[in-house]
């Protein structure tokens, strides 16, 4: 009976899983595999990326395929057969081809890695579409080696596997390239990714691995998010309880909102410990922490809350509860009232909009398949395959940036090899000015003419780059001739669009490699008057005049210093005197005219008092008339 009770949670979980996914669509994430030799099987094929190890996202790997004569399923250690696959110095890495069957995929890869293989190809033993090689579920013994697998692996179809075996058995050297450069879309300068996680810390090996990853990846995630390089969103898988079982003990203990949102019992024991509904409530709380933090422009606070909750509120210490969660929320300065409002009432017979959105998001759209594996990482709408480990996941994120837009964290020596350090990546460079067209990227390098101090270089980036536009002469003299002597510097750079390099006055040449001084004296270009004495200088000339003469450079002639000074002085004196005379004459004429006018008017006024003037009419004398 006790054994039956142990299986009940799993039977219920199966019913919960199947119900919402009766039309589930699991997408196998693939990478490209190209056979370069022999000619008979040359071509490109698809392979399914294994969900363990470290795929080289954003990169590629070339190697030679080997098919072992013994232990062909790689279920035993190759050391038992005295077989090693370590590459000899100067040789290509070894890609081990093994057969599917008899043991876990991960064990096959682990045994191959210990024998020195650089990658593993697993040939399917069934004619079927490609599937994803996953890790064993809740297997403690396998967990010990799974976390140590560092080489990539891929599943190939049965038909292609047979072709590889035939070529190898025929004595051909089979070389191929594994290419992960297009495994993740890289459309722009921002990567969108999501992590499907769980707050349950008692679900075994995978939960421990997930908790460790969140703790290790927190720093890198927050750097990327704060810099605007990524847009992260957490998700939590939930299922619903079939309507016929909503009143059962199992549904009541594992679900909230009347069976709408459920999670498995952490201890797989309904009579003790925490219930599945406790996990659902905490999952909901963590979703609301992200939502509230995102509304305040600080979505990265989710990482702080989740890691602090793991440390302060573990199930094994009986602290996995609301009180402990609220203490973490308070310590991070998050508004607990907004969290409560977001969570709603878990006992209400209503849809919870936050959890309903999570259930809808589990169903794949476009190129992204349904989320059925926990944990699942989705990068630019493609599910990540491989080890959930900081450097491996960071490589996947970095491969999602458009080339040359990656943040600095993606270009560290731990993440990629700087190809510009080897022969400048084959790009153009100006060693004297320390300028290069090689730009290191996560995928490799690009040759692009640079912008230096605001000056744009133009060219193909490989063999030619030259400064252009305003200010180009400040960069290595625009690639033109330049020389300095005795404190005098000359440059042939001209800030014009039509002319790039032109020797300055006093020089002749192509302006690029050479400008020679013109001997104005010898070539009789200046200082040629009879009284002139010419002396050539670098970039110019000196001209002196005999006697007391002065050289006029603009007119290339000599004039007398003294004569010119005396003439100038007398001219000035006569000019002043003439000006004064004219001023005096003008003043006299004005004065004479005004005075005469004034005197005439005064005399006429006096005379008008005693006698009539010709210009005035006769005035009658009334006094005399009265006397008569």
From Swiss-Prot:
Q: Which cysteines are joined by disulfide bonds?
A: 420-438, 427-447, 449-465, 473-493, 480-501, 503-515, 545-558
Residue stretches making up the PA domain:
56-168
Q: Which domain of life is it from?
A: Eukaryota
A matching Pfam family: VSR_TRX
User: Which residues does UniProt call coiled coil?
Assistant: none
Per the record, the similarity remark reads: Belongs to the VSR (BP-80) family.
Q: In which tissues is it expressed?
A: Expressed at low levels in seeds, seedlings, roots, stems, leaves, flowers and siliques.
Free-text domain note: The tyrosine-based internalization signal may be involved in trafficking at the TGN.
Report membrane topology: Single-pass type I membrane protein
Using the record's annotation, list all stretches that form the EGF-like domain.
Answer: 416-466, 469-516, 517-559
One of the protein's GO biological processes: protein targeting to vacuole
Name of this protein: Vacuolar-sorting receptor 4
Q: Which GO terms describe its cellular component?
A: clathrin-coated vesicle membrane; endosome; Golgi apparatus; Golgi membrane; mitochondrion; plant-type vacuole; trans-Golgi network
What gene name does this entry carry?
VSR4
- Side of membrane Lumenal, spans: 25-569
- Protein's cellular compartments: Membrane; Golgi apparatus membrane; Cytoplasmic vesicle, Clathrin-coated vesicle membrane; Prevacuolar compartment membrane
InterPro entries documented for this protein: cEGF (IPR026823), EGF-like_Ca-bd_dom (IPR001881), EGF-like_dom (IPR000742), EGF_Ca-bd_CS (IPR018097), PA_dom_sf (IPR046450), PA_domain (IPR003137), VSR_TRX (IPR056858)
Cytoplasmic-side positions: 591-628
Q: Which residues are glycosylated?
A: 148, 294, 434
The record lists the membrane-crossing segments as 570-590
For this UniProt entry, which residues form the secretion signal? 1-24
Residue numbers covered by motif Tyrosine-based internalization motif: 610-613
According to its UniProt entry, this protein's organism is Arabidopsis thaliana (Mouse-ear cress)
**Any one Gene Ontology molecular-function term assigned to this protein's record:** calcium ion binding
């Amino acid at each position: 009976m006790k054994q039956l009770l142990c299986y009940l949670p799993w039977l219920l979980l199966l019913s919960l899983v199947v119900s919402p996914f009766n039309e589930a669509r699991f997408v196998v994430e693939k990478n490209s595999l190209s056979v370069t030799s022999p000619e008979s099987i040359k071509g490109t094929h698809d392979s399914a990326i294994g969900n363990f190890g470290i795929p080289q996202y954003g990169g590629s790997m070339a190697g030679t395929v080997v098919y072992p004569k013994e232990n062909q399923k790689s279920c035993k250690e190759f050391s038992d057969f005295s077989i090693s696959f370590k590459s000899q110095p100067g040789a290509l890495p070894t890609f081990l081809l093994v057969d599917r069957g008899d043991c876990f995929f991960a064990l096959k890869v682990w045994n191959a890695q210990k024998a020195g293989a650089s990658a593993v190809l697993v040939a399917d033993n069934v004619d079927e579409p490609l599937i994803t090689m996953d890790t064993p579920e809740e297997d403690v013994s396998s967990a010990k080696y799974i976390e140590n697998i560092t080489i990539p692996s891929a599943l190939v179809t049965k038909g292609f596997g047979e072709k590889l075996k035939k070529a190898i058995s025929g004595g051909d050297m089979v070389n191929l390239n594994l290419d992960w450069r297009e495994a993740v879309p890289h459309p722009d300068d921002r990567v969108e990714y999501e992590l499907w996680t769980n707050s349950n810390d008692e679900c075994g090996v995978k939960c421990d691995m997930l908790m460790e990853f969140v703790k290790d990846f927190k720093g890198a995630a927050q750097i990327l998010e704060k810099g605007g390089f990524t847009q992260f969103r957490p998700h939590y898988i939930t299922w619903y309880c079939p309507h016929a079982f909503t009143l059962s003990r199992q549904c009541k203990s594992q679900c909230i909102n009347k069976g709408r949102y459920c999670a498995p019992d952490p201890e797989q024991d309904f009579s003790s410990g925490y219930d599945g509904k406790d996990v659902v409530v905490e999952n909901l709380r963590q979703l609301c922490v992200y939502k509230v933090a995102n509304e305040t422009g600080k979505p990265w606070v989710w990482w702080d809350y989740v890691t602090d909750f793991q440390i302060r509120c573990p199930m094994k210490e009986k602290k996995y509860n609301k009180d402990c969660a609220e203490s973490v929320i308070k310590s991070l300065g998050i508004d607990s009232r907004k969290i409560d409002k977001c969570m709603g009432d878990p006992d209400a017979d209503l849809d919870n909009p936050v959890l309903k959105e999570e259930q809808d998001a589990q169903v794949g759209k476009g190129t992204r398949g349904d989320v059925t594996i926990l944990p699942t990482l989705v990068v630019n709408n493609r599910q990540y395959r491989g080890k959930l480990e900081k450097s491996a996941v960071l490589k996947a994120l970095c491969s999602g940036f458009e080339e040359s837009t990656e943040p600095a964290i993606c270009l560290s020596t731990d993440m990629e090899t700087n190809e510009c350090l080897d022969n400048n990546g084959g790009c153009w460079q100006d060693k004297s000015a320390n300028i290069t067209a090689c730009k290191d990227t996560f995928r490799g390098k690009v040759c692009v003419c640079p912008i230096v101090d605001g000056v744009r270089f133009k060219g193909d980036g490989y063999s030619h780059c030259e400064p252009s536009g305003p200010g180009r002469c400040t960069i290595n003299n625009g690639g033109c001739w330049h020389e300095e002597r005795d404190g005098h510097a000359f440059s042939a750079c001209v800030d014009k669009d039509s002319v790039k390099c032109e020797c300055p006055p006093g020089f002749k040449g192509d302006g690029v490699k050479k400008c020679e001084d013109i001997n104005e004296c010898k070539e009789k270009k200046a200082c040629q008057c009879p009284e002139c004495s010419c002396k050539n200088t670098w970039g110019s000339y000196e001209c002196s005049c005999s006697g007391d003469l002065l050289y006029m450079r603009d007119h290339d002639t000599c004039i007398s210093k003294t004569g010119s000074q005396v003439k100038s002085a007398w001219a000035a004196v006569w000019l002043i005197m003439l000006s004064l005379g004219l001023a005096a004459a003008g003043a006299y004429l004005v004065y004479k005219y005004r005075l005469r006018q004034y005197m005439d008017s005064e005399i006429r006024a006096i005379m008008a008092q005693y006698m009539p003037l010709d210009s005035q009419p006769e005035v009658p004398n009334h006094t005399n008339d009265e006397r008569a």
